[in-house]
């Protein structure tokens, strides 16, 4: 657990209780209008996958108001390859009411720290050009644009 202040902490999610499921249902659609809303089984598979570490920013938008809840999420995916251990940061999302509070930065820093502990050599992420603030954040944390292209093949079962 990483403490940000008295009201916000960054924690690794281990199980899909109702509050965790509610956060995924509320936050994941903010990533993409085409992303399916995850159900409990999906969230449990994500949390239980050996290569995944899911970080949550728990807190209150305004100190002392209401119950603590998940305000943001990030998934760190560690990949063992013949060339070394690498990682990807995926599905970084902070709810609109909590944007600008430094949660994205705290989530990414927690992921980078966890990756370093696991012996990761590189951490990659992708970010759409329209996400100007997010791209600025990633660059401020040491991520550099790469001269590469991302290719995607959609399997027939998902068309």
Give a label for each model feature.
Residues 115-127:
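Conserved GNAT acetyl-CoA-binding A-motif
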Residues 56, 66-78, 88, 93:
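Conserved beta-strand in the GNAT
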Residues 79-89, 99, 146:
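A conserved beta-turn-beta hairpin within the catalytic core of GNAT-like acetyltransferases
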Residues 105, 129-147, 152-153:
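Conserved active-site alpha-helix within GNAT-family acetyltransferase domains
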Residues 25-37:
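Helix-loop element at the rim of GNAT/NAT acetyltransferase active sites that forms part
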């Amino acid at each position: 657990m990483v403490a940000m202040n008295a009201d916000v902490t960054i924690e690794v999610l281990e199980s899909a209780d109702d509050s965790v499921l509610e956060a995924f249902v509320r936050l994941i659609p903010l990533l993409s209008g085409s992303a399916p809303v995850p159900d409990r089984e999906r969230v449990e598979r994500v949390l239980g996958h050996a290569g995944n570490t899911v970080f949550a920013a728990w807190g209150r938008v305004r100190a002392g108001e209401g119950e603590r809840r998940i305000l943001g999420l990030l998934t760190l995916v560690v990949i063992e390859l013949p060339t070394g251990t690498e990682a990807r940061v995926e599905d970084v999302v902070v709810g609109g009411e909590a944007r600008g509070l430094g949660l994205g930065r705290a989530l990414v820093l927690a992921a980078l720290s966890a990756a370093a502990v696991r012996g990761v050599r590189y951490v990659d992420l992708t970010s759409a050009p329209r996400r100007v603030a997010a791209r600025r954040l990633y660059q401020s944390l040491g991520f550099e644009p790469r001269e590469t292209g991302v290719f995607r093949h959609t399997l027939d079962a998902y068309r």
